[in-house]
Amino acid sequence: MKIRVRDHVKVAADRMARIGLSGTARTQLDLYCVAPGQSQSPHRHEGEDKIYYVIEGSGRFTVGDSGERLEAGDALVAPAGVGHGLVNDGSALLLVLVLVAPPPAHVKRGPAS
């Protein structure tokens, strides 16, 4: 099933927007829309791996004790049990595709489920 990612871009004034694009019993695909100055607070998933793939913009991503600047075309893996987060410290919108496997039990499946 084709997903036109650009059709799902939404920007919230007060916090990062997480849009569920698709999901199965084994994966969840989200789009994070992060305006300048917005962030995802550091957190961890004990049973799920997360892969970030930047499609537009740039930002500072942390996994464990290390931080990396990611730009469009870069990816980063946050293994299960390791703290991770991000901040858009730039001046443009940051768009990130996020794959979580398996999806956390509390996550609502996206529209393509």
Show where each model-derived region lies:
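Short beta-strand segments in beta-sandwich/barrel cores
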Residues: 39-41, 57-63
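Glycine- and acidic-residue-biased ligand/ion/polar-headgroup-sensing regions
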Residues: 47-49, 53-59
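Conserved short histidine dyad/triad with adjacent acidic residue
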Residues: 30-45
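Conserved hydrophobic/aromatic beta-strand scaffold that supports enzyme active sites
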Residues: 29-33, 51, 75-77, 98
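A short, N-terminal "cap"/entry segment at the start of jelly-roll beta-barrel domains
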Residues: 1-30, 77, 108-113
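Short acidic-glycine-tyrosine-enriched beta hairpin
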Residues: 66-80
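Ligand-binding loop in jelly-roll beta-barrel domains
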Residues: 80-105
